Amino acid sequence: MELTPRDKDKLLLFSAAQLAERRRARGLKLNYPEAVALISFEILEGARDGKSVAELMSAGREILTRDDVMEGVAEMVDEVQVEATFPDGTKLVTVHSPIV
């Protein structure tokens, strides 16, 4: 199977997000990479589902709360930027202060 670097990045992101979801389901607080992976993955999936950039920017702030992450992680994540594929092309989605 031949994968482009972008496809490899998406698979790595999926794996990290899946791990984060499992840890969160067990009641563990997420660290920085897990939190960013989970937010990024949800944005990519939302784009795939047909949501708009504006909808994803808003929804990106509802994925995690301070209670979901380790101490200090919310302050470390100023913004999350993801290039997502929409029906009309690839767009950069930026979520400011995603962990509230």
UniProtKB/Swiss-Prot annotation:
- Where's it found, cell-wise? Cytoplasm
Predominant cellular place of this UniProt entry's protein = cytoplasm
- Quick one: which pathway? Nitrogen metabolism; urea degradation; CO(2) and NH(3) from urea (urease route): step 1/1
Reactions this protein catalyses: urea + 2 H2O + H(+) = hydrogencarbonate + 2 NH4(+)
Kindly give the SUPFAM superfamilies that the UniProt entry links to this protein: Urease, gamma-subunit
Q: Which Gene3D superfamilies match?
A: Urease, gamma-like subunit
GO terms of molecular function: nickel cation binding; urease activity
A Pfam family that this protein carries is: Urease_gamma
Q: Name one GO biological process term.
A: urea catabolic process
Coiled-coil portions: none
Q: Which UniProt keywords apply?
A: Cytoplasm, Hydrolase
How is this protein annotated for GO cellular component? Answer: cytoplasm
**Under which EC number(s) is this enzyme classified?**
3.5.1.5
- Which family is this protein grouped under? Belongs to the urease gamma subunit family.
Q: Which PANTHER family match?
A: UREASE
Record HAMAP family: Urease_gamma
> Which proteins does it associate with, and in what oligomeric form?
Heterotrimer of UreA (gamma), UreB (beta) and UreC (alpha) subunits. Three heterotrimers associate to form the active enzyme.
Kindly provide the name given to this protein in its UniProt entry.
Urease subunit gamma
Which species does the entry assign this protein to?
A: Chromohalobacter salexigens (strain ATCC BAA-138 / DSM 3043 / CIP 106854 / NCIMB 13768 / 1H11)
**Gene behind this chain?**
ureA
